[in-house]
Regions:
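Short beta-strand/loop motif that positions the catalytic acidic residue
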Residues: 192, 198-200
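Catalytic histidine-centered segment of alpha/beta-hydrolase-like enzymes
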Residues: 230-241
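Conserved alpha/beta-hydrolase catalytic His-Asp/Glu region
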Residues: 117-118, 137-190
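Flexible "cap/lid" loop of the alpha/beta hydrolase fold
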Residues: 97, 103-133
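Conserved HGGG/HGGXW glycine-rich cap/lid loop of the alpha/beta-hydrolase fold
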Residues: 5-53
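Acidic catalytic loop of the alpha/beta-hydrolase fold
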Residues: 202-207, 233
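Active-site loop/oxyanion-hole signature of alpha/beta-hydrolase fold enzymes
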Residues: 41-81
């Protein structure tokens, strides 16, 4: 796994984990702001890493373990904050529960949690998700424009999405969707000594209902935060300055 680091001269470490369907460089708009005060660590999740096109996505569990092991090996067994969005939020959830490393703060932004459903049904849902993204790989740039809100996303944003989709193979598509919705968690989940926030956009409230309920159950002290006017995975992409301000305020809270 490729790990990208910025602001290494800073004492406090912030780990950023990206959503499904994008690459590590999706954080390019917030890195220049945050690296002034924080050591930024961004894992390029296998299957979505342009520098390692031969690597496939494995599982939320394995990726969480590899990230934790890398942090430990590099003297970062305690970090300031873990931030993960969507798929990245699933990885953060698993890292927190396993407790190989410790974090002072964590933000699970629209994070995906394991289905609490009959097992055969989870396979059917996985097949549906796989088909949708596999078909998306073959959609034209013109057709893709109709999917994105032109008032929110630029032509460069749409070309970026098309480039990422074109680079995904079938194995990564299946594994990433299925694992994000069905990853395992320790039983029982240990007490986590970390300030955890679950963020979601007001426009995705219905879609995140089960995730919020699950996170509230496993992390009873979680702070649930609704970001007004936002949809899934929009905050840091469309409003980088406001996102960084809110994240820094969260990391500045005292016990």
């Amino acid at each position: 796994m490729t790990i990208h680091e910025f602001g290494k001269e800073n004492e406090e470490t912030l780990v950023l984990l990206h959503p499904l369907g994008v690459r590590w460089d999706i954080f390019n708009s917030i890195v220049p702001i945050l690296k002034k005060d924080y050591h930024i660590v961004i894992p390029a999740i296998p299957g979505f890493d342009p520098d390692m096109p031969e690597a496939d996505f494995t599982s939320v569990e394995q990726i969480a373990d590899e990230i934790a092991d890398w942090l430990i090996d590099n003297g970062l067994s305690v970090v300031k904050c873990l931030y993960g969005c969507s798929m990245g939020g699933a990885v953060v959830t698993r890292i927190l529960a396993v407790r190989k490393i410790e974090a002072d703060f964590a933000v699970i932004d629209g994070g995906i949690t394991p289905y609490q459903l009959w097992k055969p049904l989870t396979y059917l849902i996985g097949i549906r998700d796989f088909i949708m993204l596999e078909l998306g790989k073959h959609i034209s740039l013109k057709a893709l424009r109709s999917v994105f809100d032109a008032e929110k996303y630029s032509e460069d944003d749409i070309r970026y999405a098309k480039e990422v989709f074109d680079g995904l193979n079938a194995k990564t598509i299946w594994r990433s969707f299925y694992s994000c919705n069905n990853y395992s968690m320790p039983e029982p989940i240990p007490t986590v000594n970390c300030k955890i926030a679950y963020w979601y956009g007001s426009n995705e409230k219905k879609a995140r209902k089960w995730d919020i309920e699950y996170i509230s159950k496993i992390f009873p002290n979680v702070k649930i935060v609704e970001n007004a006017g936002m949809d899934h995975a929009e905050f840091f992409i469309l409003h980088p300055k406001e996102f960084c301000e809110k994240l820094v305020v969260w990391m500045s809270l005292m016990s």
